[in-house]
């Protein structure tokens, strides 16, 4: 593994401040498809080939200040060692989210790495299902969301170039339930020593299960961790907190629902009452929660078409998932009309 630092700038905008999303890919490789076209005569069959950059060396984010940026990443031992050029893709967004920029560079090769014989320790791994509050042996829903936090002082190997050196998740020791999590891995902001990967598990049968997760550092030192868990059909979600972006609200607000069903289909229902208990507004929707927070926008218009006036109100949020019963919390909403 080697440590590389890349510097650059936003062309024509010296005052640009924001965030750069960076992906560094290895050299192109020839990919040969399987000859599985049953309609093609046996003698005429020929494998389709194409070139692709299928191996990612680094994916992360870093800051841009006054149009200038720099990012550092670890080059794993598992690179192609080709004289062909690699590729850097960048996407930038300004702090005020009004301006974006894109760029790429292929004027470099990744065909060597330093060897550190002193590093024989694999990365540290912390993993959980659905929520960081998960404890080994806990109950989960049939489609739990797996997250692994990985740290290593020399960097993490998520390139997928070496045979067997993938970020790998195995359920119940079953090869049919073995998943490659390289593409889901991303380094923490401004870091090449810590990051995370994730996976939304397919529906599992009720009962006890075991998972094993394996990760490698850039010197190909492995680490593994295991979790046991019990799948319970119809298990209620954990509703950690509810809040509003504008409280007091003037013309609109956004309800924020924090829960433990990342990557799952959720059913969210919101009701608003006045302080005497009179029901004023209701809303329900289904959707996939990509993170641990589900948001619902509201323009303060009631069911009868009227506008919510200045006052103190009560809102109740209910959430369910995968056909489970609903969990609820309630809070106050203050409206101040201007």
Per-segment meaning from a language model:
Residues 4-12, 146-152, 253-261, 298:
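Aromatic/hydrophobic beta-strand junction motif of beta-rich domains
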Residues 1-5, 9-11, 111-144, 151, ...:
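Short, compositionally biased P/S/T/A/G/V-rich stretches that sit at domain boundaries
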Residues 3-37, 162, 265-272:
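Beta-strand-rich binding/interaction modules
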Residues 85-89, 145, 208-212, 254, ...:
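Short, conserved beta-strand segments of beta-strand-rich sandwich/propeller modules, principally
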Residues 23-111, 126-133, 147-233, 286-291:
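Long, low-complexity serine/threonine/glycine- and acidic-rich segments characteristic of extracellular
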Residues 201, 205-208, 285-324:
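Short, surface-exposed loop/turn motifs with a glycine/proline- and acidic-biased composition
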Residues 227-228, 232, 245, 255, ...:
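C-terminal tail/sorting-segment detector
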Residues 232-274, 284-285, 295-298, 319-324:
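Glycine-centered coil/turn sites that cap beta-strands in beta-rich domains
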């Amino acid at each position: 593994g080697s440590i590389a630092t890349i510097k650059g700038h936003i062309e024509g905008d010296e005052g640009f401040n924001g965030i750069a999303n960076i992906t560094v890919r290895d050299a192109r490789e020839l990919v040969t498809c399987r000859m599985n076209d049953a309609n093609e005569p046996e003698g005429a069959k020929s494998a389709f080939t194409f070139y692709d950059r299928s191996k990612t060396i680094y994916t992360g984010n870093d800051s841009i200040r006054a149009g200038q940026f720099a990012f550092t990443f670890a080059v794993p031992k598992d690179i192609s060692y080709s004289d062909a050029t690699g590729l850097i893709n960048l996407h930038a967004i300004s702090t005020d989210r009004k301006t974006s920029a894109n760029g790429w560079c292929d004027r470099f090769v990744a065909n060597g790495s330093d060897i550190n014989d002193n590093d024989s320790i694999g990365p540290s791994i912390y993993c959980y299902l659905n929520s960081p509050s998960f404890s080994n042996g806990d109950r989960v829903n049939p489609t739990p969301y797996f997250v692994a936090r990985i740290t290593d002082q020399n960097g993490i190997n998520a390139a997928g170039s070496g045979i067997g050196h993938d970020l790998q998740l195995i359920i119940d020791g079953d090869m049919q339930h073995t998943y490659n999590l390289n593409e889901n891995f991303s380094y923490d902001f401004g870091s090449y020593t810590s990051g995370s990967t994730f996976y939304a598990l397919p529906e599992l049968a009720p009962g006890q299960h075991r998972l094993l997760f394996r990760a490698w550092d850039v010197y190909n030192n492995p680490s593994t961790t295991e979790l046991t868990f019990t799948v319970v059909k119809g298990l209620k979600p954990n509703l950690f907190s509810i809040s509003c972006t504008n409280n007091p609200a003037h013309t609109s607000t956004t309800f924020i629902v924090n829960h433990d069903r990342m990557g799952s289909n959720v059913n969210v229902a919101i009701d608003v009452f006045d302080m005497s208990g009179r029901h004023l507004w209701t809303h329900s929707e289904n959707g996939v929660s990509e993170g641990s927070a589900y948001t619902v926008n509201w323009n303060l218009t009631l069911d009868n078409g009227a506008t919510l006036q200045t006052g103190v109100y009560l809102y109740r949020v209910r959430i369910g998932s995968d056909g489970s019963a609903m969990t609820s919390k309630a809070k106050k909403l203050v409206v101040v009309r201007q």
